[in-house]
Amino acid sequence: MKGDKREEQGPGPETVAPQQPTEDEEALIEFHRSYRELFQFFCNNTTIHGAIRLVCSKHNRMKTAFWAVLWLCTFGMMYWQFGLLFGEYFSYPVNLNINLNSDKLVFPAVTVCTLNPYRYPEITEQLKELDSITQQTLLDLFKYNASTLEAQPRHRRDVHPPLPHPLQRLRVPPPRLEARRARSSASSVRDNSPEVGRKDWMIGFQLCNQNRSDCFYQRYSSGVDAVREWYRFHYINILSRLSDTSLSREQLGNFIFTCRFNQAFCGDGNYSHFHHPMYGNCYTFNDKNNSSLWMSSMPGINNGLSLTLRTEQNDFIPLLSTVTGARVMVHGQDEPAFMDDGGFNLRPGVETSISMRKESLDRLGGDYGDCTQNGSDVPVKNLYRSKYTQQVCIHSCFQENMVKECGCAYIFYPLPEGVEYCDYRKHNSWGYCYYKLQDAFSSDRLGCFTKCRKPCSVTNYELSAGYSRWPSVTSQDWVFQMLSLQNNYTVSNKRNGVAKLNIYFKELNYKANSESPSVTMVTLLSNLGSQWSLWFGSSVLSVVEMAELLFDLSVITFLMLLRRFRSRYWSPGRGAGGAREVASSPVSALPSRFCPHPTSPSVPQPGPTLPPSLTAPPPAYATLGPCLSQSGSACAPGEP
């Protein structure tokens, strides 16, 4: 019956099992099943030279080993070169580019000082007292009797009270006692009074701290240096009591006889004035306060600044200034004039012609150099209120430490807000503090030279000077006569009373130096590509292939670790067989290939494999296992 029924149905459509998805439909991303398969595929298809030899020579193990070693050595050499290239790039080298430009140039600022510290009427009596005590000291120490002494020396000492820190003769200790003398430097200087004729003594003065618990001697081997420094120390104390309102222009005297720029007269509106404690009255021509900056369109001595200066010192301070003439400095319009650091002296009776050449330098900051653009990132406050320069920062740093350590400001540098200049009437130990601080500053223990970085943009002027006698012997009479009539001033000592100064551009060509990165990112990539092509003869796509290989290796390693983890922790009750089953299931689930590649025709291709959930046997729980009856036969389910 059933057979007839089947015959009636005839050859109908056969029952077909659900078709398994093909390999191309299984997943969007597929990976190789082993390291060997991945490496073989890479060597067969990569564009890197030499990799195919690792597969083609697999039947000759010697060749395989040779090419493997050669490939690894080449790979190592290439990455060694890569390390050198990256090391050079991250050392941030720079190239110095030199350009020669020619154009109209802005004439720099020129500062000229009298070299004659001024005697202000407000402190005349105090300066006379200092001069008198100094003359008495010279008589006591060097038997020098100056003609300015109007009375006997002993009476002079009785009239004027002694100044603090008197100048003394100091005995030079033997070398073996120098360390002991340094430890006991607070001993009285009255014991150090050897005869003048002996050579084992020096000149100096004693300086102590506030409570006189520590003292030292400021000593000099030259008597001239000792007298000048001692006089200078007391002079700036007196000068600190002078108010700024006393520095009026009406008291400056006649210093500049004539002034011309580009053959045109320059007047009061072309210069500004300031006072220097040591160099006297100073005039700055063509500074930032000038109405319009001077321009030089032609080189030569007739197209620059020409000054005729008075160098007589009728009311000079001989114990403070031992030279005569004038001091000049060339600098930028927005830079202060540091006469001690960059100036030089002019001789009386001489025409000094100074030719200039401009030179600029632009440094690279950041990783390429330790420079600052405007000083805003420097931990030192600019006291000069001008453009940042390294000298501005260094002097501001010293003044900052002076105020912090000594409680007062040094008169040579700008006065900070809320601080007064040092005066031993108010700060009796400031000299001790200053000389200690000066020693620490010179040895960079204050850190000023480290804090103050170089500016990224600098403009310098290269100077060269020429000298000639002026005026000549045949022309000096009428020249001095004209100067006397024109300026209503009589030149008493003709040749030592005047000096002439010419400052001009030697040529309008100026050198512009600039730094540029020696190795840029483009250069680095080019060098890396050159090395890659040299050792492997490949391109950027080959680098992508290497990255893909590393990615596949990491994924396969992750899958292997995942299988091991699942076999150990996810199937605890299935025994060794279950562990082997679970461990082998991901392999069967993986695709057989990553992309088509030739295989042997004799090897049968594996068919679609059912997932482990369909082929695995049911779990063997202990309660469902076979039980034996007393007769030894198996019992049916539910049977006791």
From Swiss-Prot:
<comment type="function">
    <text>This is one of the three pore-forming subunits of the heterotrimeric epithelial sodium channel (ENaC), a critical regulator of sodium balance and fluid homeostasis. ENaC operates in epithelial tissues, where it mediates the electrodiffusion of sodium ions from extracellular fluid through the apical membrane of cells, with water following osmotically. It plays a key role in maintaining sodium homeostasis through electrogenic sodium reabsorption in the kidneys. Additionally, ENaC is essential for airway surface liquid homeostasis, which is crucial for proper mucus clearance.</text>
</comment>
<feature type="topological domain" description="Cytoplasmic">
    <location>
        <begin position="1"/>
        <end position="65"/>
    </location>
</feature>
<protein>
    <recommendedName>
        <fullName>Epithelial sodium channel subunit alpha</fullName>
    </recommendedName>
</protein>
<keyword id="KW-1015">Disulfide bond</keyword>
<feature type="disulfide bond">
    <location>
        <begin position="406"/>
        <end position="456"/>
    </location>
</feature>
<feature type="disulfide bond">
    <location>
        <begin position="408"/>
        <end position="422"/>
    </location>
</feature>
<feature type="disulfide bond">
    <location>
        <begin position="371"/>
        <end position="456"/>
    </location>
</feature>
<keyword id="KW-0812">Transmembrane</keyword>
<keyword id="KW-0407">Ion channel</keyword>
<keyword id="KW-0282">Flagellum</keyword>
<dbReference type="GO" id="GO:0060170">
    <property type="term" value="C:ciliary membrane"/>
</dbReference>
<dbReference type="GO" id="GO:0034706">
    <property type="term" value="C:sodium channel complex"/>
</dbReference>
<feature type="compositionally biased region" description="Pro residues">
    <location>
        <begin position="598"/>
        <end position="617"/>
    </location>
</feature>
<keyword id="KW-0894">Sodium channel</keyword>
<dbReference type="GO" id="GO:0055078">
    <property type="term" value="P:sodium ion homeostasis"/>
</dbReference>
<dbReference type="GO" id="GO:0001669">
    <property type="term" value="C:acrosomal vesicle"/>
</dbReference>
<feature type="disulfide bond">
    <location>
        <begin position="208"/>
        <end position="215"/>
    </location>
</feature>
<feature type="topological domain" description="Cytoplasmic">
    <location>
        <begin position="561"/>
        <end position="640"/>
    </location>
</feature>
<keyword id="KW-0325">Glycoprotein</keyword>
<feature type="disulfide bond">
    <location>
        <begin position="393"/>
        <end position="452"/>
    </location>
</feature>
<keyword id="KW-0963">Cytoplasm</keyword>
<dbReference type="Pfam" id="PF00858">
    <property type="entry name" value="ASC"/>
</dbReference>
<feature type="site" description="Cleavage by Furin">
    <location>
        <begin position="183"/>
        <end position="184"/>
    </location>
</feature>
<dbReference type="GO" id="GO:0035725">
    <property type="term" value="P:sodium ion transmembrane transport"/>
</dbReference>
<dbReference type="GO" id="GO:0031514">
    <property type="term" value="C:motile cilium"/>
</dbReference>
<keyword id="KW-0472">Membrane</keyword>
<comment type="similarity">
    <text>Belongs to the amiloride-sensitive sodium channel (TC 1.A.6) family. SCNN1A subfamily.</text>
</comment>
<dbReference type="GO" id="GO:0005737">
    <property type="term" value="C:cytoplasm"/>
</dbReference>
<keyword id="KW-1003">Cell membrane</keyword>
<feature type="disulfide bond">
    <location>
        <begin position="397"/>
        <end position="448"/>
    </location>
</feature>
<keyword id="KW-0969">Cilium</keyword>
<dbReference type="GO" id="GO:0005886">
    <property type="term" value="C:plasma membrane"/>
</dbReference>
<feature type="region of interest" description="Disordered">
    <location>
        <begin position="595"/>
        <end position="617"/>
    </location>
</feature>
<feature type="region of interest" description="Disordered">
    <location>
        <begin position="1"/>
        <end position="23"/>
    </location>
</feature>
<feature type="disulfide bond">
    <location>
        <begin position="393"/>
        <end position="433"/>
    </location>
</feature>
<keyword id="KW-0406">Ion transport</keyword>
<feature type="disulfide bond">
    <location>
        <begin position="406"/>
        <end position="433"/>
    </location>
</feature>
<keyword id="KW-0968">Cytoplasmic vesicle</keyword>
<comment type="subunit">
    <text>Heterotrimer; containing an alpha/SCNN1A, a beta/SCNN1B and a gamma/SCNN1G subunit. Interacts with WWP1 (via WW domains). Interacts with WWP2 (via WW domains); inhibits the channel. Interacts with BPIFA1; the interaction is indirect via SCNN1B and inhibits the proteolytic processing of SCNN1A and SCNN1G and the activation of ENaC. Interacts with the full-length immature form of PCSK9 (pro-PCSK9).</text>
</comment>
<dbReference type="InterPro" id="IPR001873">
    <property type="entry name" value="ENaC"/>
</dbReference>
<dbReference type="GO" id="GO:0016324">
    <property type="term" value="C:apical plasma membrane"/>
</dbReference>
<dbReference type="GO" id="GO:0050891">
    <property type="term" value="P:multicellular organismal-level water homeostasis"/>
</dbReference>
